[in-house]
Amino acid sequence: MRYDKLTAKFQQALAEAQSLALAADSSYLEAGFVLKALLDDQNSGAAALLAHAGVNVPQVKQRLQQHLNSLPKVSGQGGDILPSRELQAVLNLMDKAATKRGDAYIASELFLLALVQQNDAAGKILKEAGATEQNINAAIDAVRGGQNVNDANAEDQRDALKKYTLDLTQRARDGKLDPVIGRDDEIRRAIQVLQRRTKNNPVLIGEPGVGKTAIVEGLAQRIVNGEVPESLRNKRLLVLDLAALIAGAKYRGEFEERLKGVLNDLAKDDGNTLIFIDEIHTLVGAGKTDGAMDAGNMLKPALARGELHCIGATTLDEYRQYIEKDAALERRFQKVLVGEPSVEDTIAILRGLQERYEIHHGIDITDPAIVAAAELSDRYITDRFLPDKAIDLIDEAASRVKMEKETKPEAMDKIDRRLIQLRMEKAHVEKEKDDASKKRLELIDEEINGLQKEYADLDEIWKAEKAISDGAANIKKQIDEVKIKIEQAKRQGDLALASKLMYEDLEHLEKQRAAAERADTDSTKPANKLLRNNVGAEEIAEVVSRMTGIPVSKMMEGERDKLLKMEEVLHRRVVGQDEAVRAVSDAIRRSRSGLADPNKPYGSFLFLGPTGVGKTELCKALAGFLFDSEDHLIRIDMSEYMEKHAVARLIGAPPGYVGYEEGGYLTEQVRRKPYSVILLDEVEKAHPDVFNILLQVLDDGRLTDGQGRTVDFKNTVIVMTSNIGSQHIQQMGIQDYEAVKEVVMEDVKEHFRPEMINRIDEVVVFHGLDQANIRSIAKIQLKGLEKRLEKQNLRLAVSDAALDIIAKAGFDPIYGARPLKRAIQSEIENPLAKALLAGNYAPESEIRVEADGDRLKFA
């Protein structure tokens, strides 16, 4: 016989059999080695074919191994091993069988048929296990499905559905899919399209995370439960694994062969199989090399004829980018748009998933946590979609509580660390012999004993709580498993088993769960509990705060006091601007108490006043107050935006322009730090068109960047500073605040458009500074110098008379507080730098600055 007529799979089996024979020191290549090679290869299909024929495969494997072990061994065997006479006879019978069946190639299943016809040892083993010529022939016909072997790789194309798909209906039967709540309209529309005669292929289109794949899982569950029209009952829903199709397709045409195998299997199934292709846009161009067809083009004829019942899922952007471009592919699909669910629908979805997450994490998820997850994710996580982002919050909060539960509680950890510290101290003190050391040793022993007792008590409580909690979690898991078995029994029509499970097993487990919950409640008072065993709204708020940097959690007493005393804190840095400080403080208090409009920024202000009076300093103080750091101050110098086209730098260049990928300075900063103070400095110097983009920010708290993404400004404070009208403020001095503001507003109305002024929460006019204000600012600035000197182990003391001289030197009604900085530099810092370099001051010494007439002297 010609070996080139053997299929690739059988050639591989012969090579493997030769290796087995060499390893066994056999003198010939026996048929038994080939049978073992075929049975050991998972992809050969030999074991499956024998099982299909009703043969006891484990018995065959066991007897075959015994037979091979009993074969005579020849030591020193080298080179190729020749086939035995029996094997040659089997191969000749295979050739005859292939010719009889009209095959161009000899497939490995014919080896099993020929072996049964022979009377050698391997053939006898098969016959004893139940193999006959008739049942092997019938099994071959069933596996081939009426097709001939006309290709060396024909065996690889068999069972293509098993290799390249995942059975979603089977997963639904096994209870491995999450429950799908709602989405009835979309599922009904998909079923409607699937029932069409031709082009019965729905494609689910929606934003990422809205639940497209969940709709298909919902359809699988409905098919399993028989809640679909007659034409869809008992159908299988398979997920195509495109990655498995492409993986390992080394040679040209191999990918097409695999896909053709899948399509042939589907055609043979006579419409009883639905295929789901997630991320269907990946079909366009998949497997395309020079001159080859891509998967999309190969599927078109089957889709058009209605042979392929396909459900696709993709996002709006990818549908537009890939599928709409190919009009012939697009017309074969029917669009089913999947929108984002509302907050109410998301709450219902989360309630449906609650039990699955409780079982996975082994903790309880409260209803307030579910409501908080839906509402907070909708408000604060703006770049993603419901229900995905709400599910993420629940999952992460539960994961955090589980992690705390499985690690040592904080109270025990503190005692543990203290014990380590005391034992180290004890080891050192024991070496000393004086009375003080002995006394200290007694105290250490006493403290160690006390802490060990406390630790043992806490450990006992912790273990008891953990045991109760783990027990309750285990019972929940068992309840879930019983519910799945009840559903399976109902589907199979075994009502006796279903009622036994429901009224005996389930009731018993429910009683156990109730008892475990009571034990958990009674075991310790809430105040003494070491373990957190449930997820509440506060835990969800903590996760949102960590993800976004926005303080969402309930205000602690400390923060309430801080907000009530906000003016006092800001006045430590900003001197003499009572109206401005009050306006900013009121805006922050409104937002943190939840009274502010949630669709607008926390506050938007226009600060007007002469240079150096504290406009920018107030913004820095505000950022420091809110975030304990000035890093959250986004400062934009508007003098850099004098040209009309400079607006692109704020929101990002439009498509087609250089820098499109980089994004805008303002939008990118706010996306990274959504809770910020935005300072638009010297706003009057910018081009008037730049203000047009600020209109929607001030009104709706949102801005669309160059890439079409919506950036959320609802958690920002927007401050614009300007010198407009500063000449009036200087002329009128500290008169009636409202009169000064009225005059300044006339200038503002000339420069800014009415729609801009109308959207600003408050226009705040800053006063010019008087001598007393400058003296207070001098104190603040000298404190900064004191801190810098402290790092060098030096102290600074400035007398009141010296402070008066500095304030007088730094006072200029036109330039505000900025000349003061220069005065401190020239009068104190310059001479002090020389003295330090000369080594006039030793470490730990005090530098006293005193008045000497109109000059300063250092002592």
Curated annotation (Swiss-Prot):
ATP 1 binds at G206, E207, P208, G209, V210, G211, K212, T213. Residues 6-71 are annotated as: Repeat 1. SMART domains: AAA, ClpB_D2-small. Its main location: cytoplasm. Residues 769-859 are annotated as: C-terminal. Keywords: ATP-binding, Chaperone, Coiled coil, Cytoplasm, Nucleotide-binding, Repeat, Stress response. GO terms for cellular component: cytoplasm. One of its GO terms (molecular function) is ATP hydrolysis activity. Pfam families: AAA, AAA_2, AAA_lid_9, Clp_N, ClpB_D2-small. Residues 559-768 are annotated as: NBD2. Residues 391-525 form a coiled coil. Residues 159-340 are annotated as: NBD1. It is found in: Cytoplasm. Residues 341-549 are annotated as: Linker. Residues 83-146 are annotated as: Repeat 2. InterPro entries: AAA+_ATPase (IPR003593), ATPase_AAA_core (IPR003959), Chaperonin_ClpB (IPR017730), Clp_ATPase_C (IPR019489), Clp_N_dom_sf (IPR036628), Clp_R_dom (IPR004176), ClpA/B (IPR001270), ClpA/B_CS1 (IPR018368). GO terms for biological process: cellular response to heat; protein refolding. ATP 2 binds at G609, P610, T611, G612, V613, G614, K615, T616. Part of a stress-induced multi-chaperone system, it is involved in the recovery of the cell from heat-induced damage, in cooperation with DnaK, DnaJ and GrpE. Acts before DnaK, in the processing of protein aggregates. Protein binding stimulates the ATPase activity; ATP hydrolysis unfolds the denatured protein aggregates, which probably helps expose new hydrophobic binding sites on the surface of ClpB-bound aggregates, contributing to the solubilization and refolding of denatured protein aggregates by DnaK. NCBIfam families: chaperone_ClpB. Homohexamer. The oligomerization is ATP-dependent. Belongs to the ClpA/ClpB family. The Clp repeat (R) domain probably functions as a substrate-discriminating domain, recruiting aggregated proteins to the ClpB hexamer and/or stabilizing bound proteins. The NBD2 domain is responsible for oligomerization, whereas the NBD1 domain stabilizes the hexamer probably in an ATP-dependent manner. The movement of the coiled-coil domain is essential for ClpB ability to rescue proteins from an aggregated state, probably by pulling apart large aggregated proteins, which are bound between the coiled-coils motifs of adjacent ClpB subunits in the functional hexamer. This is Chaperone protein ClpB. It comes from Neisseria meningitidis serogroup A / serotype 4A (strain DSM 15465 / Z2491).
